Protein backbone atom coordinates (compact mmCIF):
# COMPACT_ATOMS: atom_id res chain seq x y z
CA UNK A 1 0.00 0.00 0.00
CA UNK A 2 1.28 3.44 -0.87
CA UNK A 3 2.09 5.63 2.07
CA UNK A 4 -0.42 8.39 2.69
CA UNK A 5 0.97 11.88 3.09
CA UNK A 6 -2.11 13.97 3.78
CA UNK A 7 -3.06 13.36 7.40
CA UNK A 8 -1.44 14.01 10.72
CA UNK A 9 -1.53 12.81 14.31
CA UNK A 10 -1.87 15.16 17.23
CA UNK A 11 -2.41 18.87 17.55
CA UNK A 12 1.23 19.80 17.00
CA UNK A 13 2.00 17.22 14.33
CA UNK A 14 3.50 18.60 11.15
CA UNK A 15 4.79 15.65 9.10
CA UNK A 16 2.17 13.00 8.59
CA UNK A 17 2.11 10.11 10.97
CA UNK A 18 2.10 6.88 8.97
CA UNK A 19 1.58 3.47 10.49
CA UNK A 20 4.53 1.42 9.20
CA UNK A 21 2.62 -1.81 9.69
CA UNK A 22 -0.33 -0.95 7.49
CA UNK A 23 0.62 2.09 5.45
CA UNK A 24 -2.27 3.96 7.02
CA UNK A 25 -1.98 7.19 8.88
CA UNK A 26 -3.94 8.59 11.78
CA UNK A 27 -5.98 11.77 11.65
CA UNK A 28 -5.41 12.40 15.33
CA UNK A 29 -4.38 10.73 18.55
CA UNK A 30 -7.96 9.78 19.35
CA UNK A 31 -9.60 9.23 15.98
CA UNK A 32 -9.81 5.82 14.40
CA UNK A 33 -7.03 4.89 12.07
CA UNK A 34 -7.22 1.78 9.97
CA UNK A 35 -9.19 -1.44 9.71
CA UNK A 36 -7.56 -4.34 11.49
CA UNK A 37 -8.35 -6.85 8.77
CA UNK A 38 -7.92 -5.09 5.44
CA UNK A 39 -5.55 -2.40 6.72
CA UNK A 40 -7.56 0.18 4.80
CA UNK A 41 -7.63 3.66 6.24
CA UNK A 42 -10.98 4.71 7.64
CA UNK A 43 -12.47 7.96 8.87
CA UNK A 44 -15.65 6.55 10.41
CA UNK A 45 -16.40 4.53 13.49
CA UNK A 46 -17.34 1.27 11.84
CA UNK A 47 -16.42 -2.20 12.98
CA UNK A 48 -12.72 -2.92 12.86
CA UNK A 49 -11.77 0.73 12.81
CA UNK A 50 -10.52 0.98 16.36
CA UNK A 51 -6.95 2.15 16.42
CA UNK A 52 -5.44 -0.41 18.74
CA UNK A 53 -2.27 -1.54 16.96
CA UNK A 54 -1.59 1.59 14.96
CA UNK A 55 1.78 2.67 16.32
CA UNK A 56 1.52 6.22 15.07
CA UNK A 57 -1.42 6.83 17.37
CA UNK A 58 0.60 5.98 20.44
CA UNK A 59 2.54 8.75 22.19
CA UNK A 60 6.28 8.57 21.61
CA UNK A 61 7.78 11.04 24.04
CA UNK A 62 11.18 9.40 24.35
CA UNK A 63 12.17 9.49 20.72
CA UNK A 64 15.88 10.21 20.69
CA UNK A 65 17.06 10.98 24.20
CA UNK A 66 19.40 9.17 26.52
CA UNK A 67 22.93 7.87 26.22
CA UNK A 68 22.86 7.54 22.44
CA UNK A 69 21.21 10.88 21.71
CA UNK A 70 22.38 12.37 18.43
CA UNK A 71 20.92 15.26 16.42
CA UNK A 72 17.26 15.82 17.18
CA UNK A 73 14.71 13.12 16.58
CA UNK A 74 11.27 14.42 15.62
CA UNK A 75 8.25 12.89 17.32
CA UNK A 76 5.25 13.14 14.96
CA UNK A 77 2.82 12.38 17.75
CA UNK A 78 3.76 15.22 20.06
CA UNK A 79 5.29 17.60 17.56
CA UNK A 80 8.46 17.63 19.64
CA UNK A 81 12.02 16.59 19.15
CA UNK A 82 14.46 15.69 21.89
CA UNK A 83 17.12 18.20 22.79
CA UNK A 84 19.02 16.64 25.69
CA UNK A 85 19.45 13.66 27.94
CA UNK A 86 16.57 14.94 30.09
CA UNK A 87 13.85 14.67 27.46
CA UNK A 88 13.43 18.35 26.73
CA UNK A 89 11.58 18.87 23.47
CA UNK A 90 11.06 21.58 20.92
CA UNK A 91 8.20 22.35 18.57
CA UNK A 92 8.92 21.67 14.91
CA UNK A 93 7.36 24.88 13.61
CA UNK A 94 8.42 27.54 16.08
CA UNK A 95 11.56 25.77 17.35
CA UNK A 96 10.46 26.73 20.85
CA UNK A 97 11.45 24.26 23.51
CA UNK A 98 9.27 22.58 26.02
CA UNK A 99 9.95 20.51 29.09
CA UNK A 100 6.82 18.45 28.50
CA UNK A 101 5.75 16.34 25.55
CA UNK A 102 3.21 18.21 23.48
CA UNK A 103 0.30 20.49 24.33
CA UNK A 104 0.89 22.99 27.10
CA UNK A 105 4.60 22.36 27.32
CA UNK A 106 6.66 25.08 28.91
CA UNK A 107 9.32 26.72 26.79
CA UNK A 108 12.97 26.79 27.80
CA UNK A 109 16.20 27.18 25.86
CA UNK A 110 16.52 24.87 22.88
CA UNK A 111 19.95 23.78 21.68
CA UNK A 112 19.32 21.00 19.20
CA UNK A 113 17.10 23.11 16.99
CA UNK A 114 19.80 25.71 16.55
CA UNK A 115 22.34 25.22 13.77
CA UNK A 116 25.07 22.90 14.95
CA UNK A 117 28.49 24.45 15.33
CA UNK A 118 31.10 23.10 12.96
CA UNK A 119 34.79 23.48 12.43
CA UNK A 120 36.72 22.49 15.53
CA UNK A 121 38.80 19.44 16.29
CA UNK A 122 40.93 18.31 19.23
CA UNK A 123 43.78 15.89 19.60
CA UNK A 124 47.04 15.24 17.76
CA UNK A 125 45.48 13.49 14.77
CA UNK A 126 42.12 15.24 14.68
CA UNK A 127 39.96 14.46 11.69
CA UNK A 128 36.30 15.25 11.10
CA UNK A 129 34.58 16.41 14.25
CA UNK A 130 31.73 14.77 16.07
CA UNK A 131 29.30 17.56 16.89
CA UNK A 132 27.12 17.24 19.98
CA UNK A 133 23.94 19.30 19.46
CA UNK A 134 23.20 19.17 23.16
CA UNK A 135 26.31 21.02 24.28
CA UNK A 136 27.49 22.70 21.09
CA UNK A 137 30.82 20.93 21.40
CA UNK A 138 32.56 18.65 18.98
CA UNK A 139 35.41 16.20 19.25
CA UNK A 140 37.80 14.52 16.87
CA UNK A 141 36.96 11.06 18.10
CA UNK A 142 35.46 9.26 21.05
CA UNK A 143 38.81 9.04 22.85
CA UNK A 144 39.98 12.63 22.68
CA UNK A 145 38.63 15.50 24.70
CA UNK A 146 36.21 18.01 23.22
CA UNK A 147 36.43 21.67 22.48
CA UNK A 148 33.97 24.48 22.03
CA UNK A 149 33.60 25.60 18.44
CA UNK A 150 34.25 29.23 19.30
CA UNK A 151 36.68 29.28 22.21
CA UNK A 152 38.52 26.03 21.39
CA UNK A 153 38.50 25.22 25.09
CA UNK A 154 38.20 21.73 26.50
CA UNK A 155 34.62 20.72 27.11
CA UNK A 156 34.31 17.95 29.68
CA UNK A 157 30.54 17.68 29.28
CA UNK A 158 30.60 16.89 25.58
CA UNK A 159 28.49 13.75 25.30
CA UNK A 160 29.92 12.64 21.97
CA UNK A 161 33.21 11.90 23.71
CA UNK A 162 31.66 9.32 25.98
Swiss-Prot record:
Keyword Metal-binding: yes
Propeptide: 1-2
GO molecular function, one term: cadmium ion binding
Keyword Kinase on entry: no
Record keywords: Cadmium, Metal-binding, Metal-thiolate cluster
Induction: By cadmium, and to a lesser extent by mercury, copper, heat, hydrogen peroxide and IL-6.
Function: The metallothioneins are involved in the cellular sequestration of toxic metal ions.
Family: Belongs to the metallothionein superfamily. Type 7 family.
Protein name listed in UniProt: Cadmium metallothionein
